[in-house]
Amino acid sequence: MRNFTDELAKLHQLSGAEYSRHVERIALRKEFHPLDTDSEIYTVGGENSDDYQNLLIAARKAVEFGYRVYMLPNPTETRTPDFILYKKGVYRTYDLKTVYGKASIGDSLLDSVGQCNSILINMTTEYNTRRLAYAIKRYFEVNEKAWEILIFKGRKRIPIKRTLALKPEFFAFFKKAYER
């Protein structure tokens, strides 16, 4: 199999079942090894990257929600997802966005366009529900290839599929799910 960076770059050329099979092949590569401290988190290195601690915090939260996590390397020459999350036979790629303060999540989401079609938002602070819902809806409107945003907020896991975000009742649904 080609080198890891080439395999990650190939994700941009694939879609549908072919994309899913390729993600699974990447996750099953022998280069992955479990962390000494977390047997459900696999890595191929990258412990020295600037964002490693944020990735690790989100990965541990994903494990709490029943996922096996594959932390992907961050090559400089191509934009790649941060994680492969595995649960119930399904492998999915996610780009991580960690929300710390009151700054606009909208810009951060739009920055992911072209990187990955699914985003994991790890909420570490309170954020205006309506602003977040608007940013999510806008992200799906701008990125026609996007299909899911997964939000971790405390002990809540809130999945938002494209079809839901583009419905008129999305704001009411989101408020109920996010604020409960």
Task: Pin down the residues of each PLM region.
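Metal-dependent nuclease catalytic core centered on acidic motifs
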Residues: M1-V69, T98-R180
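A generic structural signal for short, solvent-exposed coil/turn residues
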Residues: K61, P75-E77, Y86-K88, N143
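A short acidic/basic microdomain associated with nuclease active sites
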Residues: V63-E77, P81-D82
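Short, solvent-exposed polar/charged micro-motifs at secondary-structure junctions
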Residues: R79-I84, P159-R162
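Conserved catalytic cores of phosphodiester-cleaving nucleases, focusing on short active-site segments
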Residues: F83-L85, G89-T98
